[in-house]
Amino acid sequence: MEVERVQAIASLGQKLDTIPSEFIRSEHEQPGKTTFDGPIPEIPVIDLGDKDGIVGAVAEAAREWGLFQIINHGIPVEVIKELQRVGKEFFELPQEEKEVYAMDMVTMEGYGTKLQKETEGKKAWVDHLFHNIWPESRINYNFWPQNPPDYRKANKEYAKHLLEVMGEILTSLSLGLGLEGHVFKEALGGDAIELLLKINYYPTCPRPDLALGVPAHTDMSAITLLVPNEVPGLQVFKDDHWFDAKYIPNAIIVHIGDQIEILSNGKYKSVLHRTTVNKEKVRMSWPVFCSPPGEWMVGTLPQLVSEDTPAKYKTKKYKDYQYCKLNKLPQ
């Protein structure tokens, strides 16, 4: 069965001032009507070079926003640029070359268009590529593009650096709750934590006021570490408003995901966010979802539960949580 890719729809509609009806959001979702247009509060920017202030800053941002940007994170600029270059080149390949990597609906890896079950039958203005980048035992190179030829090298190099950043963030989140630094990482599987890369490709859209690249959602991961290209589009929901996230070159955007909210018993917030699209420029982003293995049991940490503060969340296998989330079933 042939699947219609958004990139193909966008190229056909370049001369039009309209988009297919299945991409037009209801009024309560349309970014043209729902984006806050007053003074925008500053999303926290945290300097990982400031070793004295990092724990307090990460914990406060995770409580108040569920999202923050990190600078001086130690990942060389050229490593990020290479990751972005090879990803962009993949999406510029002829369509039939990309379809070789079409999504496997069992593992959720590969090239595709539709992921989550959409309410109201609406579609998101995005194509994507998913594949695991860590641990080695979870990597299936059948989903790693062979073109461009240095795709594998660029992704492996990025993964190596990103593991260190992930460890630093998880340690800070643990310490920020008065726990020992290793607690969160161990509660998520330790060295078995899995890193899943997604490349989002948001083609130019003639009606960015009506469409969304990705509708409002929280990430099911523990944390998500994301680098975007220079085209803004990420929006965060806070205080009943949708706010634009400012683009900071070479910063990494950190999303607190559902598993950290569960472990922390709600002290840290999984951030509700969405993505807008652009009329003139292609937007791309490279989120990496850091998650426990599928069979791993995740629940509120016992250290954070007492008679006065009972656990707010069920303990369950991560794969069962995933299934419910993707199929919009109650947890």
Curated annotation (Swiss-Prot):
Q: Which InterPro entries match?
A: DIOX_N, IPNS-like_FE2OG_OXY, IPNS-like_sf, Oxoglu/Fe-dep_dioxygenase_dom, Plant_2OG-oxidoreductases
Q: Which residues cross the membrane?
A: none
The tissues where this chain's protein is expressed are given as: Expressed in young cromes.
Q: Which cofactor does it need?
A: L-ascorbate; Fe(2+)
Domain of life, per UniProt, equals: Eukaryota
EC id? 1.14.20.6
Enzyme class label: oxidoreductase
What does the entry comment about cofactor binding?
Binds 1 ascorbate molecule per subunit.
Keyword set for this entry?
Dioxygenase, Flavonoid biosynthesis, Iron, Metal-binding, Oxidoreductase, Vitamin C
Positions bound to Fe cation = 217, 219, 273
> Binding residues for 2-oxoglutarate, per the UniProt record?
283
Pathway in which the depicted protein is active: Flavonoid metabolism
Question: What molecular function terms (GO) are annotated for this protein?
Answer: flavonol synthase activity; L-ascorbic acid binding; metal ion binding
Q: Where is the Fe2OG dioxygenase domain?
A: 191-292
Q: Which reaction does it catalyse?
A: a (2R,3R)-dihydroflavonol + 2-oxoglutarate + O2 = a flavonol + succinate + CO2 + H2O; (2R,3R)-dihydrokaempferol + 2-oxoglutarate + O2 = kaempferol + succinate + CO2 + H2O + H(+); (2R,3R)-dihydroquercetin + 2-oxoglutarate + O2 = quercetin + succinate + CO2 + H2O + H(+); (2R,3R)-dihydromyricetin + 2-oxoglutarate + O2 = myricetin + succinate + CO2 + H2O + H(+)
Q: Which family does it belong to?
A: Belongs to the iron/ascorbate-dependent oxidoreductase family.
Give the function comment from the record. Answer: Catalyzes the formation of flavonols from dihydroflavonols. Can act on dihydrokaempferol to produce kaempferol, on dihydroquercetin to produce quercitin and on dihydromyricetin to produce myricetin.
Recorded protein name is: Flavonol synthase 1
Q: What is the scientific name of the source organism? A: Crocosmia x crocosmiiflora
